[in-house]
Each structure stands twice: as structure tokens, then as C-alpha cells.
């Protein structure tokens, strides 16, 4: 009789434990039933890149002074700068400029150290081609500005879940005119400036005492 009761008790515990785990799993299922799918229906839907997204590099030829700083700071010496020295003006004249995006690691060093800001990062990331030699962009191809995801009439922009406001689980519900994820440089400076000012005033007070 005792063994029978022990078996019944063990069976009941197993049933309760199984019911608990099933309930936990169904709780997750019911929680996700209230959400919309997070799969992006590319190419009809595209994620909105953040403000500091490192995409295809844009080149402005009139600003380039052929200083080759971009080549020196590049980890793989990637940009190819072809120029001639004009003896009359004593300046370098650019003939051609090219970057092979099949080799580029998109580190952004060339953009950061360019003295004339002729290089900039765009939000273009669709660089798929059938021939890898087509990824070698010359100054004409680099000078083309891509269409922004938010301005493309045939694409539905979606914001990534990591950048959605608290409590919002659907990137489709974001307002069309909402800003991108991340802070702009001037916003970072404005946020840090009050802290620097307060620390400076505290230091001045201590020196005065």
C-alpha cells in the first residue's frame, strides 16, 4: 500500500511539473501572438539605418586635394589616388580616385581623417554584384548619392527593434517622420556640455576656498 501511494505521489508530481513547463511554454506563445512578425520582407521592406551607419563611401571630387591621407590611414592601403603635380600652380591635380568595396572593411578611418571632408559614409549597403570587379568604384560611381530608405516610394521603412521606444514591439507602427536611431554629433556635445560646465564651476569654487 505504501509503495502504491509513493508511485501515485511520484506520478502526480510528474504531472504537475509537466503542466508547469507546458504552461510556461504556452505563456511565451500567447505573449508572441500579440506581436507582429519581425521578419523584414526585403526588398519591399527595409530597415532604417542609424545615424552613424557605415555604408558605401561617398566621394566629392571638387573637394579632394590629393593629399593621400586616406591611403595612409587605411589599414589595407585601399584607396587608389592618381594625380599629377602642376608646376605652374604648384598643386596636385586629381586624375582618378577609386575604392574597391570588395576589399574595404568600412572602418571609416578615411572619412574621419580626411582634411577637406570629401569622403562621407552613406546608408547604402546593397552592394551585391555578379562580378567582384564591379565593386571597384571610380570617382564617378563614388559621387552618386544613394536614395534614402525613408525617401524611397516603393520601400516601406522599418525601424529595428533595438531602437524602438520602450513598450513598442512593432517597427511598422513608427511614425513616417520619426528620427533615426542614435545621436547626432551636436546632440552629444549639447548633452555633455552642461556636465563639463558644472565640473568646471565646482573646481573654481574649490580653488577660491
Curated annotation (Swiss-Prot):
Family, per the entry?
Belongs to the complex I 23 kDa subunit family.
Instruction: Please give the GO cellular component terms listed in this UniProt entry.
Output: plasma membrane
As for what it does, the entry says: NDH-1 shuttles electrons from an unknown electron donor, via FMN and iron-sulfur (Fe-S) centers, to quinones in the respiratory and/or the photosynthetic chain. The immediate electron acceptor for the enzyme in this species is believed to be plastoquinone. Couples the redox reaction to proton translocation, and thus conserves the redox energy in a proton gradient.
Lineage of the source organism?
A: Bacteria, Bacillati, Cyanobacteriota, Cyanophyceae, Gloeobacterales
Source domain of life: Bacteria
UniProt subcellular location: Cell inner membrane
Q: How does it sit in the membrane?
A: Peripheral membrane protein
**Which residues are noted in the entry as [4Fe-4S] cluster 1-binding?**
64, 67, 70, 114
Question: Per UniProt, where does [4Fe-4S] cluster 2 bind?
Answer: 74, 104, 107, 110
- The gene that this protein is the product of is ndhI
Origin species, per record, is: Gloeobacter violaceus (strain ATCC 29082 / PCC 7421)
Keywords of the record: 4Fe-4S, Cell inner membrane, Cell membrane, Iron, Iron-sulfur, Membrane, Metal-binding, NAD, NADP, Plastoquinone, Quinone, Repeat, Translocase
The name this protein goes by in its record: NAD(P)H-quinone oxidoreductase subunit I
Per the record, what are the reactions this protein catalyses?
A: a plastoquinone + NADH + (n+1) H(+)(in) = a plastoquinol + NAD(+) + n H(+)(out); a plastoquinone + NADPH + (n+1) H(+)(in) = a plastoquinol + NADP(+) + n H(+)(out)
Every copy of the 4Fe-4S ferredoxin-type domain together lies at 55-84, 95-124
